C-alpha cells in the first residue's frame, strides 16, 4: 500500500509499505482522511518533540478517519461504514489509567507518535476500542476533526470555565478555533483572540470572537488593564507561555495546549507567583470522543470550515509546506489517500 514518509527535516516522500494484517480482534480501516497536525510539523521541521525523536523513514498522522473494510457484526460495524479513530491505545492497567488519566498512560500505543507509525497511508489496522462510528451525515472532514476537537474538549475540562468569565484564546489554528467556540458555548462574557495571521484572525471573528488582534497587548486595553479570567494558549511560540501569563488576570487560569518550537518556553516566574495563577498543561485527551461527536452532530461546533485544503497522498509534502508557511489561507490541511470506499 502507499504511504507518506518523513525521511528527514523537510523531506517528505510517498512510497510503498507492506499491507497491514490485522491481529486478534483488530479492524482494518481504509483511510479516508488524515489531518496535518502541529505535532506532525514538529516532526517535519525538527525531527521530533522533546525526547520523542522519529526514526526515518517515519509515517506521520494521528488525526484520521476511514471506512471499515469488512462486516464485523460482533462489534456493530459494517463494511463501508465511516468511523473516526482515536489514535491512543492506553494500557488500561497502570496507576494512571486506574485513576482515569488515560491520556497520561506511560505505556500508551499512540498512532503517529514515535516509535509507532501513523495513518498517512491507504490502510491501517486499529483496535476496536479506538473506533467511534459517526452519524451517517458526517463528512470525512468532520470525522477527522474529532481528534483536535477532542483535545480542545479535554482542555476545557481542565479549564473549568465559569459563566460570564472573560476568555483569551492565543493562537487561532485548528485547536484554537475549537477552543474559541467551546468557550463561547460555555457562556463566556467576552472572548478575545490573538493571532498575527490575517486569515486566521478572520476565521476567529467568524466563529465567535468578540475582538481579534495580532498583538496580545490589546487584551490589556480591552479589559481595562485587568486581564482575562481564563487564557487558552494554543500557539507554537516559545513566548506563548509568557504571553499567556501577561494576558491573565490576578487569580486567573492559564491552559497550555500548544507545543513550542524548540520545545522550550521563556517565563518571568515572579509574575506567575504574584498573580497567583493556576496553570495546567494539556496532554492529548481523555475519553472524550463521544462528546466531541455529539457537539458536531448538534451543530455546537463548526469544524468543517476549519479544514481549508485537501491533498492526495502523493502531494503530502505540499500540505506540510503550506501549513508551515501559513499561506494561501491554510488552517487545516487534509491528506486524502482515497476519495471513496471501494
Predicted regions and their residues:
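NAD(P)H dinucleotide-binding glycine-rich loop of Rossmann-like/cofactor-binding domains
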Residues: 91-170
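Glycine-rich cofactor phosphate-binding loops and adjacent beta1-alpha1 units
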Residues: 159, 202, 206-278, 341-342
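Rossmann-fold dehydrogenase core element
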Residues: 253-255, 266-305
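Residues in the short beta-alpha loop(s) of Rossmann-like NAD(P)-binding domains
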Residues: 196-197, 260, 285
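Mid-domain Rossmann-like dinucleotide-binding core that forms the NAD(H)/NADP(H) cofactor-binding site
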Residues: 78-80, 138-217
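N-terminal glycine-rich cofactor-binding segment
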Residues: 5-21, 38-70, 84, 105-115
Amino acid at each position: 500500500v502507499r504511504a507518506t514518509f518523513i525521511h528527514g527535516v523537510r523531506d517528505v516522500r510517498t512510497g510503498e509499505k507492506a499491507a497491514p494484517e490485522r491481529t486478534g480482534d483488530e479492524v482494518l480501516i481504509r483511510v479516508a482522511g488524515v489531518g496535518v497536525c502541529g505535532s506532525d510539523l514538529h516532526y517535519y521541521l525538527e525531527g521530533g518533540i522533546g525526547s520523542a525523536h522519529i526514526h526515518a523513514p517515519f509515517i506521520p498522522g494521528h488525526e484520521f478517519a476511514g471506512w471499515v473494510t469488512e462486516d464485523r457484526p460482533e462489534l456493530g460495524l459494517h463494511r463501508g461504514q465511516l468511523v473516526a479513530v482515536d489514535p491512543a491505545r492506553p494500557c488500561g492497567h497502570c496507576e494512571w489509567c486506574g485513576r482515569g488519566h488515560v491520556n497520561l498512560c506511560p505505556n500508551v500505543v499512540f498512532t503517529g507518535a514515535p516509535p509507532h507509525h501513523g495513518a498517512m497511508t491507504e490502510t491501517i489496522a486499529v483496535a476496536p476500542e479506538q473506533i467511534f462510528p459517526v452519524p451517517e451525515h458526517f463528512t470525512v472532514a468532520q470525522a477527522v476533526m474529532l481528534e483536535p476537537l477532542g483535545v480542545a474538549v479535554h482542555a476545557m475540562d481542565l479549564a473549568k470555565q465559569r459563566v460570564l468569565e472573560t476568555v483569551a484564546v492565543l493562537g487561532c489554528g485548528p485547536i484554537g478555533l475549537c477552543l474559541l467556540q467551546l468557550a463561547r458555548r460555555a457562556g463566556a462574557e467576552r472572548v478575545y483572540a490573538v493571532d498575527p495571521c490575517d486569515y486566521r484572525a478572520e476565521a476567529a471573528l467568524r466563529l465567535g470572537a468578540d475582538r481579534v488582534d495580532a498583538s496580545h497587548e490589546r487584551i490589556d486595553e480591552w479589559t481595562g488593564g485587568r486581564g482575562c479570567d481564563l487564557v487558552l494558549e494554543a500557539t507554537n511560540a516559545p513566548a506563548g507561555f509568557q504571553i499567556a501569563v501577561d494576558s491573565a488576570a490576578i487569580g486567573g487560569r492559564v491552559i497550555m495546549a500548544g507545543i513550542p518550537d524548540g520545545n522550550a518556553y521563556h517565563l518571568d516566574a515572579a509574575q506567575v507567583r504574584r498573580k497567583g495563577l493556576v496553570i495546567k498543561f494539556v496532554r492529548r485527551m481523555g475519553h472524550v470522543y463521544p462528546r466531541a461527536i455529539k457537539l458536531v452532530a448538534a451543530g455546537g461546533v463548526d469544524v468543517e470550515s476549519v479544514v481549508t485544503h485537501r491533498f492526495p497522498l502523493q502531494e503530502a509534502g505540499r500540505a506540510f509546506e503550506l501549513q508551515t508557511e501559513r499561506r494561501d489561507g491554510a488552517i487545516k490541511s487534509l491528506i486524502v489517500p482515497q476519495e471513496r470506499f471501494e
